[in-house]
Amino acid sequence: MALAFRRGHRRGLGWGIRSQEKDYYHDLLTRLGLGLQNRMTSKVGLLSGGQRQALTLLMATLQKPKLLLLDEHTAALDPQTAKKVLDLTREMVEEQKLTALMVTHNMRDAIQIGNRLIMMNDGQIIYDVAGEEKQNLTVEDLLEKFAQASGGAFANDRMLLSK
């Protein structure tokens, strides 16, 4: 976390983390609500997938990025942990007023999160929707739009099962 926090700053040969910084990191980790504040000396590889994703999200936002890129950041998580990570994502994006680009195959998440939805197929944008029209979309509507725009039926079970 200290490296992420100091991103873009000059580094010297001083002590790694001052106690003031350690307290700051402890407070940030406590806000995540995943018990990470008690595992500050644990190796990241020993954390659960959800804990790692939340920690990565926190580290990515320590220095306000111009663009927060989230590429399938909940794909390997169980539904409860995925919801927690998505809630943390929303909170951080809104609180820090970040611009975020979230790539997902979960159509429900694509509809519910963000202010714009862009659907792609074979590297091409086939559907772009925002505002009230996006808010009124359903997964079934999105599947129909995909079939119309791509000229074929939807063939990925993973996306269908995420309803």
Q: PLM features: what roles do these ranges have?
A:
Residues 60-61:
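ABC ATPase C-loop
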Residues 79-81:
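Helix N-cap at the start of a conserved alpha-helix in ABC-type nucleotide-binding domains
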